[in-house]
Amino acid sequence: VAWNWKANGAGSANTDGDINSTVSANTTSGVSILKYSGNGTGSQSIGHGLGTKPTVLIVKCRTGGAESWVWWQDTSGNGTADQRLLLSGTQANYGNNFVTFQNTTFTTPSTNDTAWNGGSGTYVAYAFAEKKGFSKFGKYDATGTSNDGPFIYTGFSPAFVVLKRFNSTE
């Protein structure tokens, strides 16, 4: 099975923020794909093209490092990603290097890391904003029982669900 999101073609230059990016954004579905080159400095803003605050940001270093995919998520709704996960590892919630989301940009953590803004790296990022009936992001607390499991209200019938435990290395 392949899941594909249509953004908006080949992309166009975006000069919002400290680091220029090439952005292909579909504001109707809240999906943006962007490419940028790192500058090795912390707390850098990068344009995402959505026109609204994303809820999830997924970043991968394409060159200049052998880093995992990093997933940031704002589960509190305050514009700061309070959850950070490595998608290809077994680590739990990964440290306190958080991204902040604005309507036109996201700001990288204050620390410099090749996973999101190394000086010699090129990056691809996927930004997702919640759209009623299309996407919903959140978290839940499992009960630890083997019954039917929790009910998670999304407001629609999802076709694609991503689950990853963030409080344990299991």
Give each language-model segment a name.
Residues 1-170:
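Surface-exposed molecular-recognition determinants
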